[in-house]
Amino acid sequence: MADSPLVFPSVEAQRLEPHLPDLSTGTKNDVSSSSSLPFVTLTFATSLDSALSLGPGIRTALSGPQSKAMTHYLRSRHDAICVGVGTAIADDPGLNCRLAADSTPQASSHAAATAGVGALLGLASVSTDNAMIGETSSGITARQPRPIVIDPRLRWDFTPKSKVMQLARAGKGLAPYVITAVPQPPESKRKLLEDAGGKFIVLNEPKSSDTRMDLSSRRFDWHSILNAVRNEGLQSIMVEGGGEVINSLLSGENSQFIDSVIITLAPTWLGQGSVFISPPRKTSPDGKPSAVARLTNTTWIPLGEDVVLCGKIAS
C-alpha cells in the first residue's frame, strides 16, 4: 500500500481522448447514441504472442512504467473498473487509481452531474458516491473508480486484509461491488463489504439454454452485467481482465457492447502454456471460419518500450 503516485503526461492523454468517454458527462461521445448501457472500454496488456500471463494464477508483469501510468489514467476516466473472480483471487488487486493529483482529469461523469461548472473547471474538491475529484494527503488523486468483481459463485474469499478493502478503508480507493448469482451471500461478507461502502449485486444465473451465454464457463450474459452497472449510476466501465472475461466480451454478439479497445503490446513472448486472448472463432453461413473481430479508427501510441493500440470494433 506504499505505492507512490504516478504521473501520465498530458500530451499522451490528449492522444487517448478520442477513445474515451466524454470528459464532462462520462457517456458515449456519439450524441446520436440511444444506448442506456454504460460506455465500455476493453483494455489489457498482452505479449507479442497474445498472452496475458505465463499461466493460470501466475501474476505476470507486462506493462512498462509509462503504460502502467496510462492504465491508471484510464481508470481515472471511468466510473468503474471490472475484473473477473480469477483475477481477484490470483492477483489480490487494489483496483484503484494511483494517478498523482496534478494528472487528474478535470471532470468525471458523476462529479459533473452533481457539482456543476466549479467541478468541471477543477475549482473545487468534489465527493460523490461513485466518483470523486480532489487530492488526499498522500498526493494520490481522490477521483477513484468503483471496482466491479464478477463472481457468480462467490469464490473470492475477500477479507479485511484484501488490498482493495485496505485501500477503501484508507481512502485511497473504493470498496467493490461484487456481482454474483448467490441469492443470499454470507452475512459476514455482506457486512464487510457494506461497512467499507461496497455491496453484492445479485443477478439471476442464465439458464443453459440462454444463447447469449458461454456455456463452457457458465458466465452471466454481458447485457445483464452492464445493465446492473448502469443501474448503480455508473456511466462508464473499464474491463481489465482476466482472460476468461476478456475472451467472453470479445465472443459472438458480446463485442457489440464494446465502445473502445485500448491494448498495450509488450515486446516479449510468453510462450506455450500461457493464458491467451483468443475468443472462439466465428463460422460463416457456408461453414467456413472467419475472423472474430477487427479494429477500425486505430491509433498507435509508443510508450517507452511498449506500444499502445487504440481502436473501435468494426461493425
Predicted segments, located by residue:
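Enzymes that bind and transform nitrogen-containing heteroaromatic metabolites
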Residues: 1-315
